[in-house]
């Protein structure tokens, strides 16, 4: 770190370089599991309807539902089951995988180091609705041209992609918190018709990229460094070094928003009525 507290301070990062010796191949792999540290537990349908009724009565208004209906919600009768929206959309755990393959070695004239890496993260959303993939490479070569002149070539690159639903992660999570636990995912439990929710869109529809749309982010990064270092003869410790650096960065974003409908089911008509989401 040079001049960290100054306006033009710089942080110098040195990447791994090859060492003299026979070629060595190394493979590293890591698998990880991620899970939320804490997810607030929401009221179930029985608790929600009980509190909703009490709130109306305490405000001097008629009960929200009749006693018979409340009993059905409390007992979880057919058609009155509690719906866990978070469980319908999110997995309890997500997996991560990372691997790196490297090769290094060298002689008294040439040393080299190269690596290729891959990492993936499936996130917590069900149906692989959100995925992240990253590819990296690194190549460092040092060549002793003469006794006093050394050349080095350092290359590094990264390519990563994120595929996700059109709806942002926060909106999906919010939908599982805001909507009541009394509305089922599908109208009349028919998977061909996403149920219409009163507050924010149906979270199960939100993660269905084929139904509501998707977004893709792409990052490309290339770092190159070419250097020549010359030791001044007869002056111990005095060196001259020239460096050429070229960096390339490219970011791409593509989103497709599909018009979609959610539905309500008429118990008496047996018909599904569409509502624009």
Task: Give names to the regions the model predicted.
Residues 6-34, 109-187, 213-259:
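Transmembrane beta-barrel strand/turn architecture of Gram-negative outer membrane proteins
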Residues 9-10, 17-128:
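Residues embedded in well-ordered regular secondary structure
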Residues 37-67, 158-198, 250-277:
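A surface-exposed, glycine/aromatic-enriched loop/edge motif typical of exported proteins
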Residues 74-79, 111-117, 194-204, 274-277:
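Active-site-adjacent bridging/hinge elements
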Residues 81-87, 121-124, 203-213, 277:
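Extracytoplasmic loops and strand-loop junctions of Gram-negative outer membrane beta-barrel proteins
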Residues 98-100, 210, 225-227:
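Short structured motifs
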Residues 190, 201-203, 218:
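N-terminal catalytic cores of large hydrolase enzymes
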